[in-house]
Amino acid sequence: MKILFVCQHYKPEPFRLSDICEDLVQRGHEVAVLTGIPNYPEGEIYADYRKRKKRRETINGVAIFRSYTIARRQNTLYRILNYFSFALSSTIGVIFGRYKAKDGSDFDCVFVNQLSPVMMAWASIAYKNKYNKPMFLYCMDVWPDSLIVGGVKENGLIYKIFEFVSKKVYQASDYIFVTSLSFKDYFVKKFNIPLHKITYLPQYAEDLFVPNELKTNKNTIDLTFAGNIGKAQNLETILKAASAIEQIPDLAKRVHFHFVGDGTELLNMQKLACELELENTSFYGRRPLEEMPDFYTKSDAMLVSLIGDSIISRTLPGKVQSYMAAGKPIIGAISGDTQRVVKEAKCGFISPEGNVDQLVRNIRKFCLLSVEEREKLGRQARCYYEEQFSKEWFMTYLENHLKEGFLS
């Protein structure tokens, strides 16, 4: 098959789509990606891509088409310009027929890896309509509800506008993959999407996340949060729990919290840690993917949290699969699919989002476990991952659905 992927972000930016595309190339498919100019997460165009350099390139067998993109910088105005510059330029490129397969023919299908914003799907709709090809959409961020996390009011004009835009995008898709089971009901009820068009396809973890022997000859219990640090992640709950832990005599000097990642709320969370005068927390910023297994190896358990009162709270963050692939127990302040998965896997402790007291109690429960009991939780996490979230299962399932959609 000849497959055109559309996503505003791609290698060298740190997104899993690169891994998916390269695997499909290994399976014998011709793969191209219509993407933006790298500028995430710092908000500045990468040095190697300035002055119109590398607008077309090939990375590990994947053909890359880069469309005009204004760097997101670090403020709201430029983020909006960033969103619309790619959405419009990529769509115009499709309309004028700029993106072709190696032999000059059309691609067999178009697949949008839909992160934020939902407008990045416009180019895929244009391709579908221009060439009469099936359109697949993999929904990673649900719009317009993702805007609520950023403070947009559900009854406000901005929300209503993007509700209309989102409905058009989702209804234009021939097939929709969702990362969480709860998204199925959302699409059916909010956008009247037929259930048969929606398929549950949970994310997987990169191959480098494998179980490693936990270092037990240490006096501390290390708890690690890894991933994006934004409003949706609600790190405030974890930091307040860290503050409460410091007031518990038998845990004050024993438990340490590690935060690995970057995002719009990083500075605010560092400021909150200072205001709480926390001595049991460390922030490391964004680290290369290759360094993450080392952080996991040093961790006794991994942390996950999300805000409540939103469809976002019911999602299954991709970090959960990475945690489980590494064979790590999970301690979370979260509901929805993550709560279901952790309970089914019997691999950790879950409390409602925002409930600091219950999170503290769960951390204390974990600390009272023996090394053998913690290791058992980790083994159960890895076992569940292999049964439900493995990369081989994901890629085969995706490949089969792409073929079925193309042939139908």
Predicted regions and their residues:
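N-terminal subdomain of nucleotide-sugar transferases
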Residues: 1-52, 56-57
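Carbohydrate-associated surface elements
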Residues: 37, 182, 201-204
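Membrane-proximal helix-turn-helix segments that form the acceptor-binding/catalytic region
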Residues: 119, 126-131, 156-176
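Conserved donor-binding/catalytic core segment of Leloir-type glycosyltransferases
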Residues: 216-243, 258
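Nucleotide-activated donor-binding/catalytic signature segment of Leloir-type glycosyltransferases, i.e.
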Residues: 249-252, 256-260, 267-293
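A charged, aromatic-enriched C-terminal amphipathic alpha-helix characteristic of glycosyltransferases
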Residues: 358, 368-403
